Amino acid sequence: MALFTKAVKGTQDVLPAASYKNRFLENTLLDIASRFGFKEIRTPVFEHTELFARGVGDTTDVVQKEMYTFLDKGGRSITLRPEGTAGAARAFLEHGLFNEPLPQKTCYITSCYRYEKPQSGRYREFHQFGVEVFGTPAPAADAEIISLAAEIFAFLGIEDLTLEINSIGCPTCRAEYHKALKAYFEQYKDELCGTCLDRLERNPMRILDCKSPVCSKIAEGAPVMLDYLCDECREHFEKVKSYLDALMIDYVVNPHIVRGLDYYTKTVFEFVSHNDKTDGLVCGGGGRYDGLIEELGGQHTPSLGFAMGLERLLSVIEAQGIELPGDQKCDIYIGSIGDAASLVAAKLCTDLRSDGVSAQFDVAGRSVKAQMKYADKLCARFTCVIGDDDIAKGEVLVKNMENGEKTAFSIENFSDEFSSALVQAAANAFADSINDGDLNAADISNLFGGLR
């Protein structure tokens, strides 16, 4: 196959059969976030490289090994965003959102780019859902974004997840911790990878996040930050746990979580899958970054957030056999015999679409038999065929493709009558799901599809 007709390694095409599932997932995430008071923000796909070097941290794997960076025609160093927080923080500063009522709660779904080894649920171009809360130091905010993530997983029906939390302190208590880490890793200088030798001098905490098997094994015996927390950070962490207890959100304290980005302080957390097919996969995570806005040139603004990769989330959904709505079905296919009937079919479809109904008619000049085969491939829920006799009578028979029932509708009032019937059919199906005790996200989507 020619190079230019094949997607670049680490990227993927989302074809029509799958794109509707993606759209359902995206809409679900934004809808749940809006219930928590988050409003959508959109930022550029590329930023000045310095934003990520300063914000994400120049000793992180992301900045050192994974960013797509280039010089533009003006000689400026530009980077495709590897994550969403830095851009959202830059926008918060640039547009003076700190002058608005705080906290500012934003959310986004955005494409991100990292040069890493492609594997299941992980791509070089991926899509990230994230939320950011700017302007509050309160532990209640930490618990709220964790509860938002938990609500998403619960709504989607994802099971076998463990919420793991930790506190990685603040600059005050980290100073002593860094000394302890450095003393520990100095014993293994001859075994550390080259990158971690550099980190040993500049930021020893980053060694804890190294993917090298040797470095990871050494890091297992390293001191943990929980033993070095200052009184303020310890109190903050205890209050976060109290809120989680009050919200009845189960968690385990994992002292080894540090996250892969330098801006994190105090609370960090991850939702980890323990399903047989996705064991150990992090489905989402985040934490507090009280110093990020200040690092980017603003005033001290305690903030926090979390993110989850959509491709990874979809892989977990698939592994657990969770049904999401698939390709949107055609509500009705209107077949026709002859030119006059084709004009009527076109007009009826136009009226139906204006009323929010998914309707199609023949635009290829097919025979009636071929039209019905096409309707079957579209999985049309209802079909009808209009001929000269139907036009003369002023009504047409519509067939329910699920149960075979036929109902006569007036051509003159077709859109109103059919739309009402569609709503009733959706409501009946929804009631059946409730009675059967088998209600899921797909059923809810189908109901609202019928009510649109």
Q: What is each of the regions a protein language model found here?
A:
Residues 1-452:
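TRNA-recognition modules of translation machinery and tRNA-sensing kinases, especially anticodon-binding
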